[in-house]
Amino acid sequence: MNSLLATPPVPPHFYEHCRLSPSRSMSSTNPSGNRKRKAEDDYLPSDHDTRMSASPSNSPAFPPRPLPASRQIKRPRPNISGRPLSLSRLLETLDTDALRSVLRSMCDRHPELATEVVHTAPRPSVSSALQVLNNYQSALHSSIPLGGNSSSDYAYNRVRQHIVNLLDALSDFTPHFLPPNESQTSTALSYLDGATEILHRLPRWDTPQNNLEKDAAYEEMAKAWILVIREAGKRGGGIQLQYGGWDEKLSKHNQTAGGKLQDAVDVLSSNLGWMGTSQDLSNNQGVDTSSIRQQLLSGTYGSGMPLKVGRW
């Protein structure tokens, strides 16, 4: 009969005490929250350590660095079209002859550029000047006809223009290496030595009239030698001429030229007369220069000299 009696209702304020708070419900899900703390728990990484050890590569505080300008890839042009080369690229395609031709034409059209080019260009050296003369010499010999008489009038007419080109270049380069334009006599002598050697290699022709150009070039070369020798004699008493062996070199050039440089040889001999030539020094190397000293030490000095008697 008691079972048929209704259960009295529970007051509403009892339901509020039965609800769990969110904090307690979350803490109840942690399995380690209901167990005792152990010693090994001190060595386990915490959530804070895990968050600090994470890589900051994706952090917004470190924006990605841009690539350097040299590594940036050029974007293709949307519309490609033909265009001329820049000046630097155009000059790279020109060889020496083409570049010389362009520069010469510019100086002809604009004369004020000629002075600028002369002051800007480096001073030509002896080797560069002799190389130009050797190029003219090679062009001359390559134009001599093969077979037959190489010193005939026909051969001369074939190479006459090359002879003119070589002699014109020789007459232009030689004053450049003469004083006062060239202050170093050693440089001037070195150029004259090489230029005279190139002049020797000009062929001799059967017709004497065809040799007038070469003979005139020898006369001009002799004047150049005389000018440099006199200038060198003013500096240090001509010591450079003495110990450079230039007397032997010039004598050899004069012999090869058939005596056409004799005037230069005479001027050199007069400048070296007071000290003797290098040949005289080489001949006197075998003489005992200490013979007077030996006579003084042995007491025989002046034994062969007559003794003067009377008042001095």
UniProtKB/Swiss-Prot annotation:
Q: Where is this region: Disordered?
A: 1-84
**Main subcellular localization, coarse class?**
cytoplasm
**Superkingdom of source:** Eukaryota
Disulfide bond annotation, renumbered to this chain: none
Does the entry feature the keyword Heme, yes or no? no
Q: Which GO terms describe its cellular component?
A: cytoplasm; nuclear membrane
Residue stretches of biased makeup (Low complexity): 21-32
Q: Which is one GO molecular function term here?
A: proteasome binding
* UniProt feature, compositional bias: Basic and acidic residues: 38-51
InterPro entries membership = Cut8/Sts1_fam, Cut8/Sts1_sf
Q: What is the name listed in the Swiss-Prot or TrEMBL entry for this protein?
A: Tethering factor for nuclear proteasome STS1
**Origin organism of this chain?**
Ajellomyces capsulatus (strain NAm1 / WU24)
